[in-house]
UniProtKB/Swiss-Prot annotation:
Its EC number is 7.1.1.9. Component of the cytochrome c oxidase, the last enzyme in the mitochondrial electron transport chain which drives oxidative phosphorylation. The respiratory chain contains 3 multisubunit complexes succinate dehydrogenase (complex II, CII), ubiquinol-cytochrome c oxidoreductase (cytochrome b-c1 complex, complex III, CIII) and cytochrome c oxidase (complex IV, CIV), that cooperate to transfer electrons derived from NADH and succinate to molecular oxygen, creating an electrochemical gradient over the inner membrane that drives transmembrane transport and the ATP synthase. CDD domains: Cyt_c_Oxidase_I. Keywords: Calcium, Copper, Electron transport, Heme, Iron, Magnesium, Membrane, Metal-binding, Mitochondrion, Mitochondrion inner membrane, Respiratory chain, Translocase, Transmembrane, Transmembrane helix, Transport. Cu cation binds at H239, H289, H290. This is Cytochrome c oxidase subunit 1. The gene is COI. Binds 2 heme A groups non-covalently per subunit. Binds a copper B center.
Length: 513
């Protein structure tokens, strides 16, 4: 038992560990988000002052990003599916794969420690100085958060190296890059983004660490530094990061839609690959659209506005290719199909509010209001999370060999759908009316929409608990899958369900069709 789970070098076992860790962290993050919505459910103070509130917000963001979405998408689905889809016996560096996982529990422990010592790190997930300096945040909270980020970053970089090596070196002999499954492509591009962006974050937070403890002044104007430098460094990581969070979701949705449509491949397969590459590349040249209010030159703002809008083009290509894949099929509203359709629609809504925010002139007004919160929660809470849910219910029979109850899954989908939309749609109105982010209290004008938003969060909580109940029900009833309804073009379903410990004893042969 100890050898299997602690010292594992098997991509499936490590993937399962990532899933268990991510689901646990997701429940912690959800609990924090409910604390936020409980505080905002009515005017006046509930939990305490803004420092406590902002500590909760900061922890919620870090946990959801670094310990829920990334471990599940890249660690869970990536580890499980990339070797199976490539026909590889395992990942390229199995022991490094194990280390990537085991760096995460210490990392989350450091993050939780940062909340419970001193006053907590109430900086927001961006950790901007001078608020995060040792004057405004004395004590070790921010330092612990920085070390937590270091560990999570090392974990992701090692994982990225592993995926890139696996994808380049462990394909079947005659499989060219354009024949690779879209999910493998999406994980490969994600890994490349991680590899290029995380070192910049590491540099920024290390400089912040020395500013706080070793008396340097990288971000302190009194010593010739500039806090804006930190913002540039952080967002040079932070913007690719949001594409890292969504790209594997794109890959999963492509697979689910083409398989559920009964098509042998996604419409415009090659275009999908180029679109993901374009999104990855453009993701690196638009970072300052997070900084339209710091007083940049007008030409700079014009450039970042237009460059940001260009990202909508490859994203649109993906949306329309998914719709074209669905075209002409008799749609079977299975749970995984419902999640995919929900993803396409709600991700599009989130993308449209993003295009609005890309206008620097409008963003000056909307920056740091709930409009921004609504925008990124539409693409994360209804993009990334819907993709995770869809991928999970789609590949669960492959991972476990068991069936989930489709009737309960549909009830769960509609509960969650109503919950998240009720939570985040009203926040657009709050933002347009000027309600600022990161405050625990607000003028009475904003009360009604906040009550509705908080109500939605309670519905989402019920949906989350329902999902856990469905998984539990499946595990105790053990409805064993007899045969998968797969297309010939998805080779992961040719395994036993669940797959054997060693799935490919010899490399599969690719035939031209």
């Amino acid at each position: 038992m100890m050898r299997k789970w602690l010292y594992s070098t098997n991509h499936k076992d490590i993937g399962t560990l990532y899933f268990m860790f991510g689901i646990w962290a997701g429940m912690v993050g959800t609990s924090l988000s409910l604390l936020i919505r409980a505080e905002l459910g009515n005017p006046g103070s509930l939990i305490g002052d803004d420092q406590i509130y902002n500590t909760i917000v900061t922890a919620h963001a870090f946990i959801m990003i670094f310990f829920m979405v990334m471990p599940i998408m890249i660690g869970g689905f990536g580890n499980w599916l990339v070797p199976l889809m490539l026909g590889a016996p395992d990942m390229a560096f199995p022991r490094m794969n194990n280390m990537s996982f085991w760096l995460l529990p210490p990392s989350i422990m450091l993050l939780i420690s940062s909340s419970i010592v001193e006053n907590g790190a109430g900086t927001g997930w961006t950790v901007y100085p001078p608020l995060s300096s040792n004057i405004a945040h004395s004590g070790s909270s921010v330092d612990l958060a920085i070390f937590s980020l270091h560990l999570a970053g090392i974990s992701s970089i090692l994982g990225a190296v592993n995926f890139i090596t696996t994808i380049i070196n462990m394909r079947p002999n005659n499989m060219s890059l354009d024949q690779m499954p879209l999910f493998v492509w999406s994980v490969g591009i994600t890994a490349l983004l991680l590899l290029l962006s995380l070192p910049v974050l590491a540099g920024a937070i290390t400089m912040l660490l020395t500013d706080r403890n070793l008396n340097t002044s990288f971000f302190d104007p009194a010593g010739g530094g500039d806090p804006i430098l930190y913002q540039h460094l952080f967002w040079f990581f932070g913007h690719p990061e949001v594409y890292i969070l969504i790209l594997p979701g794109f890959g999963m949705i492509s697979h689910i839609i083409s398989q559920e449509s009964g098509k042998k491949e996604t419409f415009g397969c090659l275009g999908m690959i180029y679109a993901m590459m374009a999104i990855g590349l453009l993701g690196f040249v638009v970072w300052a659209h997070h900084m339209f209010t710091v007083g940049m030159d007008i030409d700079t703002r014009a450039y970042f506005t237009s460059a940001t809008m260009i990202i909508a083009v490859p994203t649109g290509i993906k949306i329309f290719s998914w719709l074209a894949t669905l075209h002409g099929t008799q749609i079977n509203y299975s749970p995984s199909m419902l999640w995919s359709l929900g993803f396409v629609f709600l991700f599009t809504v989130g993308g449209l509010t993003g295009v609005i925010l890309a206008n620097s002139s409008i963003d000056v007004t909307l920056h740091d209001t709930y409009y921004v919160v609504a925008h990124f929660h539409y693409v994360l809470s209804m993009g990334a999370v819907f993709a995770i849910m869809g991928g999970f219910v789609h590949w669960y029979p492959l991972f476990t060999g068991l069936a989930l109850n489709p009737y309960l899954l549909k009830i769960q989908f509609f509960t969650m759908f109503i919950g998240v939309n009720l939570t985040f749609f009203p926040q657009h109105f709050l933002g347009l009316a000027g309600m600022p982010r990161r405050y625990s209290d607000y003028p009475d004008t904003y009360t009604s929409w906040n009550i509705i938003s908080s109500l939605g969060s309670y519905i989402s909580l019920v949906a989350t608990m329902l999902m856990l109940m469905i998984i539990w029900e499946s595990l105790i009833n053990k409805r064993i899958i007899l045969f998968p309804l797969n297309m010939n073009s998805s080779i992961e379903w040719y395994q036993n369900l669940p797959p054997a410990e060693h799935s490919y004893n010899e490399l599969p042969i690719l035939s031209n069709f």
